[in-house]
Design a protein with these regions (language model features):
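Extreme N-terminal, non-catalytic leader segments
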Residues: 39, 55-73, 77-78, 92
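N-terminal phosphate/diphosphate-binding loop that engages ATP/GTP or pyrophosphate donors
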Residues: 72-78, 82-156, 165-166
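Non-catalytic interface/targeting segments
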Residues: 164, 259, 264-326, 382-425
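Conserved catalytic-core segment of NTP-binding enzymes
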Residues: 180-259, 328-390
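Flexible, charged surface loops at secondary-structure boundaries
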Residues: 63, 168-171, 312-321, 336-340
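Phosphate-binding/switch loop-helix module in NTP-utilizing enzymes
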Residues: 147-189, 194-198
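Short, C-terminally biased terminal segments at protein or domain edges
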Residues: 1-59
Length: 425
């Protein structure tokens, strides 16, 4: 029998503990968990000991001057966009030249005859990024694009497109990318978070909205899938009184699992609030007065369906609320106007009496009228609270302060092997 071939000896590992060298035609297979995409898995030919990668053009295109950091989440509406906004500002404050992009667009609007991603537009504007630091979204994830892909009408090779569009950014120190809503979203187009991270050789930071101690399970699962690409996590929306307990339980546990906890962000009512203008849009409401105060922020919802004495006690316990009540419940409307109310939403499309409108004008409280019943109105408002965005200037200031106080930017820079003293070009 012949002597078995000598096993291939892997090259010396990359010096960075978080970003191993991407595979090339001379390097062995590099695996980041069980979810590495087919394009980067090597084929082992029969009777050969060495591996021959089938996807080699990536490493040739990677610009050496910019690294990639992908911000993702374990579930939608975890605070990913807010984290991106706050983090990018901290990076700029450290003197780093940052580029930004969102490969999969979900919040699209039409501007000047073309579709733009609203999050990209807003964050780029907040950071004063020049055009060459903004990478357009590749794909709008909506019903139409999904149908086209499922019917086979869209045969685009998004992996190739991702390389061509995102790996040509040779300027700046860091390309900060906002990932999909969870680890699976985008898989239909080969653009899930693990796939994107693998293709562009990106480090990953995940944002997780805290719900209970069992929130660690989704992070452990993500670690299994992403492996060493996952360089850290941010635990968001934690009740302030529970943060000390998390520092003694979840933080050390995750660190033992080689998951760096870069920040534990306290729950903040302002960041979970919605503007009156957003409620007008979602409810298709008519504004009866104070259309100039639609920028007021609503932090809670109250339903005026009880007697007036109970309503007064109920309203006094709440702050910055939207009150939903029937257009014929004048006594409830009056009680709401004398408490911490940001807007009054009247159902049934019944107009309020003139003295209610006059008092609302004096107190600068918008009154909205909707052609809906109370239950449907409450459901829409609740859903709006569950899909909060950070497109108001007051929220930008808030998230910057939260991140500056509760996020370990120095540790992130160390994990990325970036120097805060780097000079801008």
């Amino acid at each position: 029998s012949s002597t078995p071939p000598t096993p291939h000896t892997p090259p010396t590992p990359h010096t960075s503990p978080t970003l191993p060298t991407p595979p090339t035609s001379q390097s062995p297979n590099v695996s980041y968990g069980n979810n590495a995409i087919a394009l980067v898995r090597p084929k082992i030919r029969k009777h050969q000991a060495k591996v021959v990668p089938t996807f080699e053009f990536r490493s040739a295109c990677v610009p050496k001057s910019a690294k990639h950091l992908l911000i993702g989440s374990t579930e939608a509406y975890s605070g990913k966009s807010a984290t991106v906004l706050g983090l990018s500002y901290l990076l700029q404050q450290k003197g780093l030249d940052v580029a930004y992009g969102k490969p999969i667009g979900t919040c699209l609007s039409e501007s000047a005859g073309s579709m733009v991603e609203e999050d990209v537009q807003f964050i780029a504007g907040s950071l004063n990024l020049p055009e060459n630091r903004i990478v357009p979204s590749m794909l709008a994830l909506n019903e139409a694009t999904i149908q086209k892909r499922l019917r086979g009408e869209d045969k685009t090779d998004y992996c190739q497109a991702l390389v061509q569009q995102y790996l040509q950014i040779s300027v700046g120190h860091l390309v900060l990318l906002e990932g999909p809503g969870n680890l699976e979203e985008g898989s239909l187009f080969n653009l899930s978070l693990p796939q994107v991270a693998e293709i562009i050789d990106a480090a990953v930071v995940l944002v997780s909205r805290y719900q209970s101690l069992l929130s660690v399970e989704s992070l452990l699962s993500a670690k299994q899938r992403l492996g060493k690409r996952l360089i850290g996590v941010v635990i968001n929306d934690v009740p302030a009184q529970q943060i000390p307990a998390l520092d003694k339980t979840i933080r050390p546990f995750l660190e033992q699992q080689d998951i760096a906890v870069l920040g534990i962000l306290p729950k903040n009512d302002l960041l979970r609030s919605v503007s009156v203008r957003e409620l007008v849009n979602q409810l298709n409401a008519e504004v009866l007065c104070r259309s100039d105060r639609l920028d007021l922020m609503v932090e809670s919802l109250a339903i005026g369906a009880m007697n007036v004495n109970a309503a007064v006690k109920y309203f006094r316990k709440r702050r910055n609320m939207a009150v939903v009540t029937g257009g014929d419940r004048v006594e409830i409307q009056q009680a709401a106007l004398e408490t911490s109310t940001q807007c009054l939403i009247l159902t049934g499309q019944l107009p309020p009496p003139n003295f209610i409108l006059t008092r609302a004008e004096e107190l600068e409280i918008p009154i909205l009228s909707v052609d809906l019943d109370t239950l449907t109105t409450v459901e829409i408002v609740d859903r709006t609270f569950g899909q909060v965005r950070v497109h108001e200037p007051v929220k930008v200031h808030c998230i910057r302060n939260l991140m500056a106080e509760h996020f370990d930017i120095a540790r992130l820079l160390s994990l990325l092997d970036l120097s805060p003293a780097a000079a801008l070009p």
